[in-house]
């Protein structure tokens, strides 16, 4: 309920709605929890923000580009985006969607069902275990460093607050969907190669709901926000794990 947000001591300038049950595979086993958190939870955030017309910046998912009905996670993240659009159109609530592309970086999860492929490889490499690769490893992903993601979110918030403080329209940011991807992708085999061409790997069956490719081709974040990703996945792996 909206009372869940009473912990705020004062009205925030912007709400970053980043909370979600992430990852595709766990959503098959926990569909109710996934819908409650990702869809119902998002509507509650929006309803609370609507009371004071507080801008909401939402963490969307690049998986929304694929088949929205192939797994509960993708469907609920897409529903979250649609809720953002609904509240913006019907109640004129300032909402912005930032789609994330396979986020990685320091202190990422390396254990449990919510860790990413980079986190899994990190754990396996440090433990001297073979890297487990699903399918044939030729599925491709656009990977974005957490620092670049944060930079994109901050640029959104700064644009909104600056425009509001100066009595200007926020329409160039609110109501928009920004893709926070690098515009370059790597196959999972190429990611594994970064840990060493000769490092052992093990191929396992394809998982349900797995997409063949993600790649950011939209330039709106660059054109409107001046956002430009600075980090590269392969360089990150070699710097922090291999060298």
Regions picked out by a protein language model, each given a short descriptive name:
Residues 41, 117, 187:
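Conserved alpha-helical elements of sugar-nucleotide-dependent glycosyltransferases
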Residues 126-243:
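C-terminal substrate-binding subdomain of Rossmann-fold SDR/epimerase-dehydratase oxidoreductases
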Residues 7, 25, 122-123, 169-170:
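Short secondary-structure boundary/capping segments
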Residues 43, 62, 68, 107, ...:
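Gly/Ser/Thr-rich beta-alpha loop segments that engage phosphate groups in nucleotides
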Residues 72-74, 78, 82-141, 146-157, ...:
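NAD(P)-dependent short-chain dehydrogenase/reductase
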Residues 1-103, 153, 157, 227, ...:
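N-terminal Rossmann-like NAD(P)+-binding domain of SDR-like oxidoreductases, especially those catalyzing
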Residues 26-27, 67-69, 107, 143, ...:
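Short glycine-/acidic-enriched loop or helix-start segments at secondary-structure transitions
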């Amino acid at each position: 309920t909206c009372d869940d947000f009473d912990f705020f001591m004062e009205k925030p300038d912007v709400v970053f709605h980043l909370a979600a049950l992430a990852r595709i595979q766990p959503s098959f086993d926990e569909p109710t929890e996934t819908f409650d958190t990702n869809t119902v939870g998002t509507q509650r955030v929006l309803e609370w923000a609507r009371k004071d017309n507080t801008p909401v910046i939402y963490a969307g998912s690049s998986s929304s580009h694929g088949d929205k009905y192939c797994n509960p996670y993708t469907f609920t993240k897409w529903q979250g985006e649609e809720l953002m659009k609904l509240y913006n159109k019907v109640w004129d609530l300032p909402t912005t969607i930032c789609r994330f592309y396979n986020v990685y970086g320091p202190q990422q999860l390396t254990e449990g069902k919510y860790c990413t492929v980079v986190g899994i490889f990190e754990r396996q490499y440090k433990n001297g275990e073979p890297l487990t690769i699903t399918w044939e490893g030729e599925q491709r992903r656009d990977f974005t460093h957490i620092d670049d993601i944060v930079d994109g979110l901050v640029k959104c918030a700064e644009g909104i607050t600056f425009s509001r403080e100066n009595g200007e329209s926020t329409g160039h940011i609110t109501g928009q969907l920004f893709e926070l991807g690098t515009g370059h992708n790597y196959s999972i085999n190429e990611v594994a190669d970064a840990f060493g061409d000769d490092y052992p790997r093990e191929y396992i069956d394809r998982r349900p709901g797995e997409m063949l490719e993600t790649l950011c081709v939209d330039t709106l974040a660059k054109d409107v926000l001046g956002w430009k990703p600075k980090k590269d996945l392969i360089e990150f792996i070699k710097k922090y794990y291999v060298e």
